[in-house]
């Protein structure tokens, strides 16, 4: 399996499985001198961890991160940062009956065909449990971005099933278990999720993440455009089936006179492009949305096959999220932070001394 690392100068490598002893990550390229502690990383890990509300999986993992290396006397040393989270609430017996069965809609079949074997306990390496380490690594990037450049990254659930956020109150996002910015829809969300759990079903969601105060100039055309790397990062998150930058697929119905973000001496008149032009950050807010599919781990009977190719009907057991989009919010924030961190270091390496007479717009 060769796809366990992400980034070039700020590079993150993760390891571990859903029901293994532990999850881990190695973070390379972090500049020295950044104040960082396990408590800093724990903030975002607590936002992502399972068992925090009745709307997510009942699996209870404390997700307590340990910094093994790369930090001395509270500051990064510039060497590899080793991170570890122990798994403590595995129930592998929940999966013994699917050892020879492919769960429809999961990675079971493709992992089996590619590698000739698979860890059937909670999906093994294909489980979203792995994303805990992305969140831990992303927390390092988020702190650097904010402390050194003033960059803030905020994610939220913009749609759950048919329920869309119509109002936006940033203060509400961390005040409810949905990361939802529209307080007027919380009761509707609660009832919808209750009904969904009674059905034994699941539903998809849309997550939006916004980065503010991003400097102009990040992105490496032509193959490492900033939007291309962001899309790559978001599509690497479990269950993500689509990514939009700015207005995304809505541009299909727009005319050029509407979509172009006109410029004045006072700044940009709009931000349909989502803060990226020609693969390079424009200095405006970077706006990213992603669509997540409904999890296939449901108690509604479904058709599948076993390893012998025989047709069977199955009901998925175990502990699962009825909507994976809820806990995807801090994951999306982390992945955007990793991309921006990597591109800041790459930009600094080649273009640090570049100056123009043109004022920077917002």
Swiss-Prot record:
Catalytic reaction(s) noted: 5-O-(1-carboxyvinyl)-3-phosphoshikimate = chorismate + phosphate
Keywords in alphabetical order: Amino-acid biosynthesis, Aromatic amino acid biosynthesis, FAD, Flavoprotein, FMN, Lyase, NADP
Cofactor binding summary note: Reduced FMN (FMNH(2)).
Binding, FMN: 125-127, 238-239, 278, 293-297, 319
Example GO molecular function: FMN binding
Pfam families registered for this protein in UniProt: Chorismate_synt (PF01264)
Cofactor dependency: FMNH2
Stretch forming the signal peptide: none
Pathway(s) of this molecule: Metabolic intermediate biosynthesis; chorismate biosynthesis; chorismate from D-erythrose 4-phosphate and phosphoenolpyruvate: step 7/7
Binding locations of NADP(+): 48, 54
Cellular-component GO terms for this entry: cytosol
Enzyme class at the top of the EC tree: lyase
Membrane-spanning intervals of the chain: none
HAMAP family referenced in this protein's UniProt entry, alphabetically: Chorismate_synth
Purpose of the protein: This reaction introduces a second double bond into the aromatic ring system.
Family named by the database record: Belongs to the chorismate synthase family.
Quaternary structure annotation from Swiss-Prot or TrEMBL: Homotetramer.
Protein name: Chorismate synthase
């Amino acid at each position: 399996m060769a796809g366990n690392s992400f980034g070039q100068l700020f590079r993150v490598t993760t390891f571990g499985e859903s029901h293994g002893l532990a999850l881990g990550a190695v973070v390379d390229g972090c500049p020295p001198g950044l104040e960082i502690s396990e408590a800093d990383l724990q903030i975002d890990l607590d936002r992502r961890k399972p068992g925090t509300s009745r709307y997510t999986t009942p699996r209870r993992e404390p997700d307590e991160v340990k910094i093994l290396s790369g930090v001395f006397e509270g500051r990064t040393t510039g060497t590899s940062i080793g991170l570890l989270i122990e798994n403590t609430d595995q129930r592998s017996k929940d999966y013994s009956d699917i050892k020879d069965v492919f769960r429809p809609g999961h990675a079971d079949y493709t992992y089996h065909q590619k590698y000739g074997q698979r860890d059937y306990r909670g999906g093994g390496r294909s489980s979203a449990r792995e994303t805990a380490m992305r969140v831990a690594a992303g927390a390092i990037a988020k702190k650097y971005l904010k402390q050194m450049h003033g960059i803030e990254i905020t994610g939220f659930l913009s749609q759950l099933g048919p329920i869309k956020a119509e109002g936006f109150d940033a203060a509400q996002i961390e005040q409810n278990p949905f990361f939802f910015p529209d307080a007027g829809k919380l009761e509707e969300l609660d009832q919808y999720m209750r009904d969904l759990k009674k059905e034994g079903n699941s539903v998809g969601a849309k997550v939006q993440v916004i980065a503010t105060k991003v400097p102009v100039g990040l992105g490496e055309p032509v193959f490492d455009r900033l939007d291309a790397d962001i899309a790559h990062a978001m599509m690497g998150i479990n269950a993500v089936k689509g990514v939009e930058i700015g207005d995304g697929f809505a541009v299909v119905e727009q005319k050029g006179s509407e979509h172009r973000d006109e410029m004045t001496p006072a700044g940009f008149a709009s931000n349909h492009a989502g803060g990226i032009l020609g693969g390079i950050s424009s200095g405006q807010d970077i706006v990213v949305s992603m669509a997540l599919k409904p999890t296939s781990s449901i108690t509604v009977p479904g058709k599948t096959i076993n390893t012998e190719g025989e047709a069977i009907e199955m009901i998925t057991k175990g502990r699962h999220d009825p909507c994976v989009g809820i806990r995807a919010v801090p994951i999306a924030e982390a992945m955007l932070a990793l991309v921006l961190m990597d591109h800041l270091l790459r930009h600094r390496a080649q273009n640090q001394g570049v100056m123009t007479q043109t004022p920077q717009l917002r």
